[in-house]
Design a protein with these regions (language model features):
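Positively charged n-region of N-terminal signal peptides that target proteins for export
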Residues: 1-5
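Bacterial N-terminal signal peptides
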Residues: 7-15
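Electrostatic cytochrome c docking/interface patches
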Residues: 20-40, 56
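Flexible coil segments in periplasmic/lumen-exposed cytochrome c-class electron-transfer proteins
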Residues: 21-29, 97-98, 102-128
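Stable alpha-helical elements in mature extracytoplasmic
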Residues: 33, 73, 77, 99-100
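The canonical Cys-X-X-Cys-His
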Residues: 37, 41-51, 103
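Gly/Gly-Pro-rich "capping" loops immediately C-terminal to redox-active cysteine motifs
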Residues: 50, 54-94
Length: 128
């Protein structure tokens, strides 16, 4: 008797987990309404990288974006924003190509940075 109760519970649990995974995989991430680079930065990025881009150390290390030579070209920030790495969450499903290009341009031309070149949505699409 106990074995059949256990098997029934186990079977129902597996079905519930599988259904939940299917739901999560089929759900689309909500989109951020902001389209300007500064607005996107302050809505998402500044919580960890700080409003002035100086970064922080607390529960983790949040690298400074201000004066960061890794931002000289657009490839690194496009990759990090789209795919994430370690504590940096991937935002590629949350932001569209134009939003990623806008925030990349913002961090490369503000926060004490003045790197050359503009990133386009096409650059982001090609890097995905």
């Amino acid at each position: 008797m106990m074995r059949s109760v256990f098997m029934t519970v186990a079977f129902l649990s597996v079905g519930t987990v599988a259904a939940a995974q299917d739901f999560v995989q089929s759900a689309t991430a909500p989109r951020l309404p902001q389209t300007e680079g500064a607005a996107i930065y302050h809505a998402i990025c500044s919580g960890c990288h700080m409003p002035d881009g100086q970064g922080a150390i607390g529960a983790g290390a949040y690298p400074a974006l201000a004066g960061n030579e890794m931002l000289e070209g657009p490839d690194y920030p496009i990759f990090m924003i789209t795919h994430g790495q370690k504590a940096m969450p991937p935002l590629g499903d949350y932001l569209d190509d134009a939003q990623i290009a806008a925030v990349v341009n913002y961090i490369r031309h503000n926060l004490g940075n003045d790197f050359e070149g503009e990133t386009t949505p096409g650059d982001v699409a090609a890097a995905r």
